[in-house]
């Protein structure tokens, strides 16, 4: 079984009524009606194409990528903590 690398996008919409239309681009895991955003998981291989298609939609205000792959995942004690 292969694990497909996925990434999350935070998509800010102008109106939440368009949430249903963007379901075809990925898997929606969270939506906030007050702040008008949707958190969606997509395949990393298709990320560039999907972001390009989403930005062309009139009702998409902004798209932010997940910072997870840039975070440090192994934690070690810092030099000042050892002493």
UniProtKB/Swiss-Prot annotation:
InterPro entries referenced in this protein's UniProt entry, alphabetically: DUF2129
One GO cellular component term noted in the UniProt record for this chain: cytoplasm
Predominant place of localization: cytoplasm
Subcellular compartments: Cytoplasm
Cytoplasm in keyword set: yes
Bilayer-spanning residue ranges: none
Keywords from the UniProt entry: Cytoplasm
Name the record gives this protein: UPF0298 protein SERP0712
